[in-house]
Amino acid sequence: DVQCGEGHFCHDXQTCCRASQGGXACCPYSQGVCCADQRHCCPVGF
């Protein structure tokens, strides 16, 4: 698993995304990033 900070984990081959609310989300991409809306996950370069 991938650690995303305090007590938050994502599965292998996923990426952690820091949301605007200070939470973290798991992206289903190995190189994911937060989208501009800070709520969804996008592939890099999206």
UniProtKB/Swiss-Prot annotation:
Coiled coil: none annotated. It is found in: Secreted. GO terms for cellular component: extracellular region. Keywords: Antibiotic, Antimicrobial, Disulfide bond, Secreted. SUPFAM superfamilies: Granulin repeat. Transmembrane segments: none annotated. GO terms for biological process: defense response to bacterium. Its main location: secreted. InterPro entries: Granulin (IPR000118), Granulin_fam (IPR039036), Granulin_sf (IPR037277). Disulfide bonds join 4-16, 10-26. Belongs to the granulin family. PANTHER family: GRANULIN (PTHR12274), PROGRANULIN (PTHR12274:SF3). This is Antimicrobial peptide eNAP-1. It comes from Equus caballus.
